[in-house]
From Swiss-Prot:
InterPro entries found in the cross-reference section: Ribosomal_uS19, Ribosomal_uS19_bac-type, Ribosomal_uS19_CS, Ribosomal_uS19_SF
Pfam family, one: Ribosomal_S19
Residue ranges the record marks as coiled coil: none
Name this polypeptide is given: Small ribosomal subunit protein uS19
PROSITE patterns given in the database record: RIBOSOMAL_S19
Gene label: rpsS
Known role: Protein S19 forms a complex with S13 that binds strongly to the 16S ribosomal RNA.
Family the entry assigns: Belongs to the universal ribosomal protein uS19 family.
Keyword annotations: Ribonucleoprotein, Ribosomal protein, RNA-binding, rRNA-binding
The organism of origin for this protein: Bacteroides thetaiotaomicron (strain ATCC 29148 / DSM 2079 / JCM 5827 / CCUG 10774 / NCTC 10582 / VPI-5482 / E50)
GO cellular component entries: cytoplasm; small ribosomal subunit
GO biological process: ribosomal small subunit assembly; translation
Gene Ontology terms, MF aspect: rRNA binding; structural constituent of ribosome
HAMAP family xref list: Ribosomal_uS19 (MF_00531)
Amino acid sequence: MSRSLKKGPYINVKLEKRIFAMNESGKKVVVKTWARASMISPDFVGHTVAVHNGNKFIPVYVTENMVGHKLGEFAPTRTFRGHAGNKKR
């Protein structure tokens, strides 16, 4: 089920404030966040956000194509190691 349109997108307030501050000052610093559910807004474009995947922070450079998606989509939490196969002896 998707989020109600009357509520608007969820963007972490602390993350949004840090991005706005960087846009005003012109600085580009990697921002660490645990807010995987945050929606990427157009203000995030051009910044690098380090998204936590449960183990470590994955740096995500935000482009225009990512606007409207969630930060967690770009930091996978599971690693696929392959299915058991025939071992060569």
